[in-house]
């Protein structure tokens, strides 16, 4: 029976995403100057104010206030009328040293015995629905806002955009779980003042449909036919959206965990990513399970896969690993048997995850908006400046968990040709 499925995304200027980006910028700076830093950093943003709190064990000394301001500046909060502006907002830091009780559970005599930073379960998901092995509704929702931010920065075709925005996409699926139609698209974008509300609504709706949508449609050759005139558009459905960002809503780190992952597909263990160094398995194991799921799909093992792993705090070996193929497996094995082979291919102890995915590098700022999954692996150079003027330039590989570097190993292990 056909059904509808919906996913949402939020822009880099959304209050919760500002908080995520500040927390991850701090992670990157700590790791740039001390790769063994242990960090758990939370951020709160509100009208004219940023509050930083968390636990750190590191040899690095940072100007956390300037790091926070730099993030805010890059996002685009550079005007006093936003009531949250990079140069003038207050930045309060309550960051302190990590608990020795927690640290003793992570640090061991040998690196291989490094324990999980906490208990919990983590999930990784992949589907052959899109080229990047992500659910289509979420993929479109992200790209709507990526392109909207690009239009804002270009400041040519659309000149009234402000940083805060949200999107939502509803797809219709057929009896075979294949997307056949875009039912509805919701876009809410912060904007400058207009002369009148009717003029504002008319202009924004026209620009979204005639400028934004074609840019997004061009990225989906396979699904271009889904972008038709039957789509229901809800553009700024509440009307005026001048007051936004942290002045409109308080933002906190870790409140957009479904946007960060699979848009409601698969499952989520509940642990947020941003502000956590890779010793926290909430983050590292979620990346590792995505890496597994994506390589299983790319190898042709199944059409859809959910991988679960769980840990006990201070224990290196996972307490469980489970693979769910939703009945789409192409090999004549039970999901239980598939799970056992996956466990042999991928070492899921925290230290080995860190090494395999190169997670002790400053690679996290780029993850903090528009999804941690489904992104393109790439090598870039990043430069960091310490308060004493020390400059560090590092060549790092982003989104290593998106690499298809285990496809051959998976095919060999499962006898897939």
Model-flagged regions — what are they?
Residues 8-10, 14-19, 115-130, 242-267, ...:
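Conserved phosphate/anionic-ligand binding catalytic regions in large, soluble enzymes, centered on
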Residues 39-58, 313-317:
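Short, charge-patterned binding micro-sites
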Residues 1-40, 155, 407, 413:
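N-terminal, positively charged regions that mediate nucleic acid binding
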Residues 37-41, 165-171, 231-235, 301-312:
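A short glycine-rich, hydrophobically flanked beta-strand micro-motif that places a catalytic Asp/Glu
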């Amino acid at each position: 029976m056909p059904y509808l499925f919906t996913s949402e995304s939020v822009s880099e200027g959304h209050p919760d995403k500002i908080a995520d980006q500040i927390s991850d910028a701090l992670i990157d700076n700590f790791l740039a100057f001390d790769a063994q830093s242990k960090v758990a950093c939370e951020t709160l943003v509100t009208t004219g104010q940023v509050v930083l709190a968390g636990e750190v064990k590191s040899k690095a000394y940072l100007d956390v206030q300037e790091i926070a301001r730099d993030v805010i500046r890059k996002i685009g909060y550079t005007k006093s009328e936003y009531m949250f502006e990079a140069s003038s907002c207050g930045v309060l830091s309550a960051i302190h040293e990590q608990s020795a009780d927690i640290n003793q559970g992570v640090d061991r005599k040998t690196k291989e015995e490094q324990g999980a930073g906490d208990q919990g379960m983590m999930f990784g998901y992949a589907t052959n629905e899109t080229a990047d092995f992500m659910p289509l509704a979420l993929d479109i929702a992200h790209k709507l806002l990526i392109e909207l931010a690009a239009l804002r920065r270009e400041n040519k075709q659309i000149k009234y955009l402000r940083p805060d925005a949200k999107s939502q996409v509803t797809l219709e699926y057929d009896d075979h779980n294949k997307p056949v139609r875009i039912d509805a698209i919701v876009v809410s974008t912060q904007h400058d003042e207009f002369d009148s509300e009717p003029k504002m609504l008319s202009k924004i709706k026209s620009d979204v449909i005639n400028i934004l949508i074609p840019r997004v449609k061009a990225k989906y050759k396979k699904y271009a036919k889904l972008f038709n005139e039957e789509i229901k558009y809800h553009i700024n459905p509440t009307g005026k959206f001048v007051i936004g960002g942290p002045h409109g809503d308080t933002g906190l780190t870790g409140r957009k965990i479904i946007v960060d992952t699979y848009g409601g597909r698969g499952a989520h263990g509940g642990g947020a990513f941003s502000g956590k160094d890779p010793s926290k398995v909430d983050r590292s194991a979620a990346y590792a399970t995505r890496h597994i799921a994506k390589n299983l799909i790319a190898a042709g093992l199944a059409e859809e896969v959910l991988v679960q792993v769980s840990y006990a705090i201070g224990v290196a070996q996972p307490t469980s690993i489970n693979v769910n193929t939703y009945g789409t497996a192409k090999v004549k094995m039970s999901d239980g048997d598939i799970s056992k082979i996956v466990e042999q291919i991928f070492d899921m102890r925290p230290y080995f995850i860190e090494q395999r995915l190169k997670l002790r590098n400053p690679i996290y700022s780029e993850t903090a908006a528009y999804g941690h999954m489904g992104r393109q692996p790439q090598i870039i150079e990043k430069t960091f400046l310490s308060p004493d003027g020390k400059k560090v330039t590092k060549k790092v590989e982003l989104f290593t968990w998106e690499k298809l570097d285990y496809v051959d190993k998976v095919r060999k292990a499962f006898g897939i040709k």
